[in-house]
């Protein structure tokens, strides 16, 4: 009986460990974000739009930036899943967008950057 209870407890913990692995590290994300600073900032538009408060924001609506028609019409809200797809391959996520970034293919760095973006409110 003890083995059955232990097995059930371990089985219940597996989803929690998977979530912990998916959670990004904001400090590592700040470092991974460094190349993005060539176009993006927090609190002002640059070559790319202002990313302050981007998590949870609708795509293509930040005031003062000239977005592509494709991004404006995408209907995307920048949640974790959409940010992951976008940062991995912007041209595949929204064909016709203006972002020239080829994408970040490393899933750990993606999670870290998204965690970092989430701290920029």
Regions found by a protein language model. Give the residues of each.
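Short Fe-S-cluster ligation motifs
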Residues: 63-84
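Electrostatic cytochrome c docking/interface patches
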Residues: 16-33, 73
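His/Cys-centered metal/cofactor-coordination and adjacent catalytic loops
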Residues: 21-23, 43, 47-54
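C-terminal capping alpha-helices of c-type cytochrome domains
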Residues: 79-121
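Solvent-exposed helix-loop boundary motif
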Residues: 49-69, 88
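Bacterial N-terminal signal peptides
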Residues: 7-15
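The canonical Cys-X-X-Cys-His
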Residues: 29, 33-42, 113
């Amino acid at each position: 009986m003890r083995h059955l209870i232990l097995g059930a407890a371990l089985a219940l913990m597996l989803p929690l460990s998977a979530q912990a692995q998916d959670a990004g590290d904001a400090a590592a994300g700040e470092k991974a974000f460094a190349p993005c600073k060539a176009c993006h900032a927090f609190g002002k538009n640059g070559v790319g739009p202002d990313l302050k408060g981007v998590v949870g924001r609708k795509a293509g609506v930040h005031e003062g930036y000239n977005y592509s028609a494709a991004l404006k019409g995408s209907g995307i809200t920048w949640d974790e899943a959409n940010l992951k797809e976008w940062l991995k391959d912007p041209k595949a996520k929204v064909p016709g967008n203006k972002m020239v970034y080829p994408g970040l293919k490393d899933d750990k760095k993606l999670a870290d950057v998204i965690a970092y973006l989430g701290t920029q409110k």
